[in-house]
Amino acid sequence: MKTLTIGDLKARIPIIQGGMGVGISLSGLASAVANEGGIGVISAAGLGLLYKKLSPNYTEAGNLGLAAEIRKAREKAKGIIGVNVMVALSDFAELVKTSIAEKVDIIFSGAGLPLDLPSFLKKDSVTKLVPIVSSARAIRIICEKWKNNYDYLPDAVVLEGPKAGGHLGYKENQLEDEHFSLEELLPQVVEEVSHFEEKYNKRIPVIAAGGIYTGEDIKRVMDLGASGVQLGTRFVTTTECDASDAFKESYVKAQEKDIEIIKSPVGMPGRAIHSHFLEKVKAGMKQPKVCPFNCIKTCDISRRPYCIVTALYNAFKGNFENGYAFAGSNAWRTTRIMSVKETISELINEWKRSDQPTLSSR
């Protein structure tokens, strides 16, 4: 596998561990991946619940919690640490400022177009900025806006395909449409980015994400022009993952039929593992219409059947009567819990085997 270079950062293994909230990827998982030569990513989503003891104010608790997680990751790891901050979060600006102040290596940002992300950088900032997109058009808009308004271009871009877990940047009818597959979109994004690279003489690596599960998958997308990959689902079933054992076991026990598309209160489709809670939602369950968090810009709790941050927090703790686990399309393929070291070693070995010429091709 080739080294992944993002600005002056070099990851020995071109694997980014995707940010997963609420509480699934914190300092434990991120530092473990970074120590193995990949890029570990802390999710900023929902930290106000995990760190509610630090402040009665959800936003303040979340920012204090994020700073604490970044510092813990730094203590545990010598490698590259990133933070995922969704544009849809109401405290997006505060979380970005905290990440930059803590000198995190990279901010990954999706669930909306992060058009003002460079505005938070200061002259002495070292943090790299990496948007997450679902189309060539989206990265073109971001590059043009960033260059025109801030004289800045993305340090890399993540293209997240429709087989990813969690919230999806696609309409529901596009999820099974081959025209929107990762393999179809990736060359388009690589070509779009190349125009800005050539015009402004800046390298912008494209990272492929969504449904990448094996070393063979990594080889396939890198042959299509990706400089690296982002994996989330594969890292959930690791000993270092910050989720509860019950959360991890929900992946191990899942069958292919259990992976389903849901309508999130955020207003986007999402991919999750079937649970009793989701059955209640489909049956018309209505929860109290009071929201103490206001954590998502697009979420009007008076029109939604449940609070998503509470549901995801419950799942993080293993309470599936009152929550559910987001998961990628390949979550059902998981058979056991292993260490991050074992997982990355397995991915590398799979990649090496797929890179060997077959007898017939010699």
Q: What are these language model-derived features?
A:
Residues M1-K199:
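Active-site entrance/lid segments in N-terminal catalytic domains of soluble metabolic enzymes
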Residues I16, A164-I207, Y213-R362:
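Conserved active-site-proximal phosphate/metal-binding subdomains
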